[in-house]
């Protein structure tokens, strides 16, 4: 989206929820000052908080010690926008080590963490430490394809999956908080056809396109058009996704 389109989307969502729900803006600018300006525009458009992405040059080259902490500090100080810490997958060089996570989560303005480390050894090791050291931090799973494993350790989900299946995901969060594995497993199994058709693809970016087809199946979007560099899915994918949504009993809304 262009900068103007980003602001328009935030304003449209703020208007549509009539101030009943907080609107979280993704802050993705590469440079720290650029990200701070993006956060200021989000505040002006009505966003309640921001999900601050890592600088994407770090994906390939890694980051200098202290740079992520500085990014969160500057963006919050210059914009006043409350921030969600975003943990990237362990297979990238933009993933934060435990010390960095603890440092950022202790900084002013950081109130939650969206954790998508996608390494269950790290998850099982680091989440208990973060819980102990930062008890007031909201921990949100980013693991669309691993919700069952992570549901028992979190305060909620911050996942694209929530766009297409909010009803069963809310049930799964409740089951996780209650320690009800049987219920959580039932929901996992019910959703598995959707999980496979949307997220078990060659690229996670294909899941973004697949999500749009699922939103069409639910009657939320009229079409699944995407912009480059995203591309349409292969022939037959639309039917596969619609069939999976029906199998999971996720019908049209409204």
Language-model regions: role of each:
Residues 38, 100, 145-146, 211, ...:
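Residues within well-ordered alpha-helices
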Residues 74-78, 89-195, 199, 203:
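Catalytic alpha/beta core domains of metabolic enzymes, predominantly
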């Amino acid at each position: 989206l262009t900068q103007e389109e980003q602001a328009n989307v935030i304003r449209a969502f703020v208007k549509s929820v009539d101030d009943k729900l907080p609107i979280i803006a993704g802050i993705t600018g590469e440079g720290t000052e650029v990200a701070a300006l993006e956060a200021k525009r989000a505040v002006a458009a009505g966003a309640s908080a921001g999900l601050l992405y890592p600088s994407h040059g770090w994906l390939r080259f890694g980051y200098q010690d202290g740079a992520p902490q500085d990014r969160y500090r500057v963006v919050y100080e210059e914009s006043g926008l409350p921030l969600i810490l975003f943990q990237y997958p362990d297979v990238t060089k933009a993933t934060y080590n435990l010390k960095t996570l603890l440092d950022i989560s202790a900084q002013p303005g950081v109130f939650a963490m969206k954790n998508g480390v996608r390494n269950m050894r790290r998850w099982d090791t680091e989440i208990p430490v973060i819980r102990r050291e930062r008890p007031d931090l909201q921990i949100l799973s980013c693991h669309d394809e691993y919700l069952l494993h992570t549901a028992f350790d979190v305060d909620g989900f911050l996942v694209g999956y929530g766009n297409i299946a909010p009803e069963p995901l809310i049930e799964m969060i409740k089951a996780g908080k209650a320690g009800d594995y049987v219920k959580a497993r039932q929901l996992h199994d019910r959703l598995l056809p959707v999980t496979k058709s949307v997220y078990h693809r060659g690229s996670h970016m294909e899941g973004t396109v697949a999500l749009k087809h699922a939103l069409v199946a639910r009657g939320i979007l009229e079409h699944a058009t995407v912009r480059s560099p995203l591309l349409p899915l292969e022939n037959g994918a639309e039917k596969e996704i619609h069939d999976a949504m029906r199998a999971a009993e996720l019908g049209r809304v409204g």
